[in-house]
Amino acid sequence: MIPRIRINRAWHRRGKRVAPALPAALLVGWTTATLPFFPAHWSAGIAFLAALLTVVGPRLGLAFALAVPVLPLGNIALGLAIVYGIAACAWFALFWARPRAALLFVAGPLLAPLGALGLFPLVAVAAGGPGRRAAQTAVGVLTAGIVAGIGGGTLPVTGGAAPNLAIGGIAAPATAASTLWDALTGSQAFLLETLALAGAAAAIGAARRRGPWGGAAFGAFLTVLTLFADAGASAPPLVLAAWLSAALIAVEPGIPRPLPEFFRRSRVRLRLVHGS
C-alpha cells in the first residue's frame, strides 16, 4: 500500500492565496530587468507591486503582470507589442475563471536549465481542464525557448541553437507575428516536443487519484510520447521526469477514483498469471 499525503487545510488556503504572487513577480521582474525600457533600479519595485496586487486580487495582479511587458516590447517593435497585447488579452480571458493559475507558464524557463521540462504536465495540473493544461504547457515550453534565445543559449529538451529573435523595428503586427512564429517553429524537434508535453498535460487528468496504476500509466505514456517526438532528445531527463511524475500521481491525496475497465481487467490477468 502506497501512503497518501495529508495536507493541512489552513496552510493550503494560505498557500493558494500567496503562491500566485511568485510567478507574477518573476514575470514582471524578468521583463523589466531584461528588456530595455524601465530604469534598472525599478525592476524590484515593479515586481513587488505585481506580487502585492496578486495577493490583494488575483485578477488585478494578473492584469498588471500581463500589461507590464507591453511597454518594453513596444520599445523594441510596435508590431510585437500589438501582437503580445492581443495574446495577453486572450490569455486573460482564458484564465478569467482561474486567475491564480494563469501564470504557471513562468515555470518553463525555471525548469529548462535543470533539464526538467518533462515535469511541466505535472505543474500544469493546477491550470484546470485539459485545454488550459495543454495551453499552459505549450506556452511554458515556448517561453523557455524564447528566454534561451534572448540569452544566447540552446533550445531546451532538444538542444541546438535557440531561435533568432531579431525582430526589432517591425511596425506591422502581421509581420511581427509571422517572424516570431517562424523563429519559434524553426526547430521541428522542439515543436514536436512542445506538442508532446502539451498532449501529456491534457491527458494527465485521466491518471489522477487512481493510485499506483494511474501513476504508472501516465509515466509510461509521457515517456513514450516525449521520446518518440524526437529520437535525438536526451532520454535520461525525460524518463526521470516521467517517473517522478508517476510517483507523485500515485500518492496524490483525495478521494480515489476507480480504474478504467481496461486496467481492472489487466490487473485480474496479471494476478491469474502470478498465481498459476
Residue ranges and their predicted role:
Residues 63-70, 80-84, 99-111, 138-139, ...:
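Cytoplasmic-side transmembrane-helix entry/capping segments in multi-pass membrane proteins
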Residues 1-12:
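Short, Lys/Arg-rich, polar N-terminal cytosolic tail immediately upstream
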Residues 110-246:
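Generic multipass alpha-helical transmembrane bundles of integral membrane proteins
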Residues 27-35, 52, 123, 147, ...:
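Alpha-helical membrane-inserting segments
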Residues 13-67, 71-75, 79-82:
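Hydrophobic transmembrane alpha-helices
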Residues 69-98, 111-112, 149-156:
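Interfacial aromatic-anchored transmembrane helix boundaries in multi-pass membrane proteins
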Residues 45-56, 64-71, 88-95, 105-110, ...:
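Generic transmembrane alpha-helix motif of multi-pass integral membrane proteins
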Residues 257-276:
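Short, highly charged, low-complexity non-transmembrane loops/tails of multi-pass membrane proteins
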